[in-house]
Amino acid sequence: MLATGTLVVVADGSSALIYRNSGHETISLDLVQTITPHSLLNDGPAGAAPVEQSPHDRDEATFSKQLVHKLNAMALSHHLPDAVVIIADPTSLGHMRPLYHAELKRRIVRELHKTMVKSSARDLAAALSKP
C-alpha cells in the first residue's frame, strides 16, 4: 500500500508522467504533471556518448538525466513528499540511478523496472498493489 500523497514518477526515455496517490485505503493516482524533453531545460548529453550510441539513444539518456535533475531540485527545495516511487524501463533506470541526489534517494520507497508510461492510472495502481 502506498501512503496518501506519495508521488509516482512513470518514465521512459522520451516522457514522464507524475502522479500523486490520493487514495487512503486503496491506490488512487491523479495525474499531476506531464514532462517531455521540450518542457525541461537542455542540459545536453548525459556525459560522454559512446561512439556506437545512436542519436535516439543519446536523446533518451539526456532526457533521463534532465528528469533526475528536476527531481533532485524538487527534493532539495522540499517540493517532493517523503515518499516517491519511480517506475521506468530498465535502460532509463540505468541512466537515472547514478544521478540520484541523497535527498531524492532518501525519499524513494520503491522502484519498478517496467515500461509503463503509456499505461492507465488503473494499470499503474494494479502494478503498485503487487509486492
For the regions a language model picked out, list residue spans one by one:
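Terminal alpha-helical anchor/extension segments at protein ends
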Residues: 1-131
